[in-house]
Amino acid sequence: MPRKRVIARREVLPDPKYGSVQLAKFITILMLSGKKSLAERIIYGALGRVSEKANQDPMDVLEKALENVRPLVEVKSRRVGGATYQVPVEVRPERRSTLAMRWLVEAARKRSEKSMDLRLAGELLDAHEGKGTAVKKREDTHRMAEANKAFAHYRW
């Protein structure tokens, strides 16, 4: 790893339909085996279904869903004197959004609806209402951090 200079982060181009950088990142996280056009079709289909069911702007629903799933704290393992402690650490804003998107996609993949756009739409609507598997994952993460608050002084 070079020590000389900080490497510039790659600029993410906004998605073609809604012009949102966040949605472009969501498409990339959903994508499997480099099939970006398929991921775009799934997301745009899911957002179409969300706008039908919720009678709201799909981008507003997506933003609220992400807000309800974003974790504030997480636990990281830290080895101290032969024992491994789960140390609660605050999550950086960039990682918050990435984790939220990743958890939404994971939760959607585990659902039982027939097609992926139906599953993703269902998970987005659930997260928008503050329920669903992705929101539960966030609550579990927060609970773990709260339970291990005593080890917060091991932060690095």
Curated annotation (Swiss-Prot):
Q: What family, per the record? A: Belongs to the universal ribosomal protein uS7 family.
| InterPro entries noted in UniProt | Ribosomal_uS7, Ribosomal_uS7_bac/org-type, Ribosomal_uS7_dom, Ribosomal_uS7_dom_sf
This chain belongs to the protein called Small ribosomal subunit protein uS7
- As recorded in UniProt, coiled-coil segments are none
**GO cellular component terms attached to this protein's record:** small ribosomal subunit
Give the quaternary structure.
Part of the 30S ribosomal subunit. Contacts proteins S9 and S11.
Q: Which CDD domains match?
A: uS7_Bacteria
Q: What does this protein do?
A: One of the primary rRNA binding proteins, it binds directly to 16S rRNA where it nucleates assembly of the head domain of the 30S subunit. Is located at the subunit interface close to the decoding center, probably blocks exit of the E-site tRNA.
> Might you name a Gene Ontology BP term for this protein?
translation
Keyword annotations of the record? Ribonucleoprotein, Ribosomal protein, RNA-binding, rRNA-binding, tRNA-binding
Q: Determine the domain of life of the protein's source.
A: Bacteria
GO MF entry, a single one: rRNA binding
